[in-house]
Amino acid sequence: KAFLPMMLEQREGCIVNVSSVFGFVGFPAQGAYNISKFGVRGLTECLWSELAGSGVRAVSVHPGGIKTNIEIAGRRCAAAGEEESRLAKLGEKLLLTPPAECAADILAGVERGDLQIVTGNKSSTLHWLSRLLPDRYPKILRLLTG
């Protein structure tokens, strides 16, 4: 909101909104997180139309599997028990992409003019799974996550 008027006046700029691969797929036990990330994606897609012809672009970034402390910081409580422990173990297996690699992917995507940038371990797989098999991917996710 603060920078958009200036970008519109200059007829150039790029708004980069960070969503998540969970902005494409509804992941088990992540409902609140999914809502926020689908929302970021929806806002960005709305901006594609609203900014058309203005010289200003909007990009949604969908990282996943980035090796940060998000899984540890996002733990809810010990009372969540077995489900929490299972998700923590899954996170250890999937959070493999270094943050610097993710940042490089984002910069490259912005420079290419991409509207969506999908980066990180298994993120492209989940993205295409949700697009090509929208009625089947939830079952596949359940099988993969145990």
Predicted regions and their residues:
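Active-site loop immediately N-terminal to the catalytic Tyr-X3-Lys motif
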Residues: V25-G31
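SDR active-site lid
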Residues: G53-N121
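Alpha-helical segment proximal to the catalytic Tyr-Lys
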Residues: P5-M6, S49-G53
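A short helix-coil junction within the Rossmann-fold of NAD(P)-dependent oxidoreductases
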Residues: A2-R11
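Residue(s) in the substrate-gating loop at a strand-loop-helix junction
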Residues: S20
